[in-house]
Amino acid sequence: MFRLYKQKTIFTEMTNSNKVSGKIINYNDSYSGEITFDENILNINKIEEINSENYIIPGFVDLHCHGGGGFDTMDGVQAIQKMSSYHLSKGTTSLLATTWTSSFEHTYAALNDFNSLIDMSSNLIGVHLE
């Protein structure tokens, strides 16, 4: 089972419950707990003992991403969308699409593609020029 929580919004595959329990890990602490949610996180409870193999961790941030899942950031809008979806499915909740060293025209076209997707992508947060 895969559940992804981003900025208190829950993205999920295979969930029929409004609770998830496991080892909660954040930037300065870790503890056993349970998260209750609807479309947003409603409550986080610490639990003394828990019978779960789950880990609940912050999503990964990739600051230098040339592609993923067989798709390249310089290959157009559809490739960027598929690359973005691939990374999201693996737990990367934020990424900077990184250009390759290329001609001005090719780089400019890639920047236009990124610009057209930045508001539609759930994990594309910007561009890194190489």
Feature roles, as predicted:
Residues 1-49:
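N-terminal metal-binding scaffold of metallo-dependent hydrolase/deaminase domains
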Residues 25-31, 55, 73-75, 109, ...:
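Metal-centered catalytic cores of metalloenzymes
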Residues 28, 121-122:
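Solvent-exposed alpha-helices and their adjacent loops that cap or buttress functional pockets
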Residues 36, 60-62, 72, 96-98, ...:
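Short, conserved beta-strand segments within well-ordered enzyme catalytic domains
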Residues 47-53, 110-121:
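Short amphipathic alpha-helices and their capping/turn segments at secondary-structure boundaries
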Residues 66, 81-110, 122-130:
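Divalent metal-dependent hydrolysis catalytic cores, especially in the metallo-beta-lactamase
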Residues 70, 90-92, 115, 119:
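Membrane metalloprotein/metal-transporter helix-bundle signature
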